[in-house]
């Protein structure tokens, strides 16, 4: 993919992060988002694992039949990236691709602990900041990201 295309994707992700913010986020919100993601994946015939955490506490976790422990490892690795940067894991993936420097080299991080690949999106409270994250694993990185974005947009538009 060309650098200009990657730059456009990067800008779009920043817009998502800026606009897809919550006024509050409860355990019930986590449940509704998680169920929406699972039902959407089922309807579309996709096998995923999903995790929603707030303030370091897991509020929702579900692994569809056909997913494995490897999906859980990917979730944790993506979550560490969001926790470190307060940006989506897809944004960090694209920024690494633009720079041409692998994420792990740039930040001197262990690749077995951190995964800058799409699928983990920060839960941000307006005028507060990042308080958690929504993570999907099982699909290509951009599709994992898109599934989370669809769920957040749907939830915020209710």
From Swiss-Prot:
It comes from the Bacteria. Pfam families: HbpS-like. Belongs to the UPF0303 family. This is UPF0303 protein BcerKBAB4_3106. The lineage of its organism: Bacteria, Bacillati, Bacillota, Bacilli, Bacillales.
């Amino acid at each position: 993919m060309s650098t200009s295309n990657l730059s456009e994707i990067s800008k779009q992700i920043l817009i998502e992060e800026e606009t897809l913010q919550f006024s509050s986020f409860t355990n019930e919100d986590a449940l509704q988002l998680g169920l929406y993601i699972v039902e959407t994946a089922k309807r579309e015939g996709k096998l995923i694992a999903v995790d929603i955490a707030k303030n370091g506490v897991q509020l929702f976790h579900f692994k569809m039949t056909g997913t494995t422990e490897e999906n859980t490892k990917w979730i944790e690795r993506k979550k560490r990236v969001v926790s470190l940067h307060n940006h989506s894991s897809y944004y960090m993936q694209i920024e690494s691709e633009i720079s041409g420097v692998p994420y792990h080299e740039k930040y001197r991080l262990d690749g077995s602990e951190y995964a800058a690949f799409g699928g983990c999106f920060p839960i941000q409270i307006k005028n507060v900041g990042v308080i958690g994250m929504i993570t999907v694993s099982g699909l290509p990185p951009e599709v994992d990201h898109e599934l989370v974005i669809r769920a957040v947009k749907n939830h915020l538009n209710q």
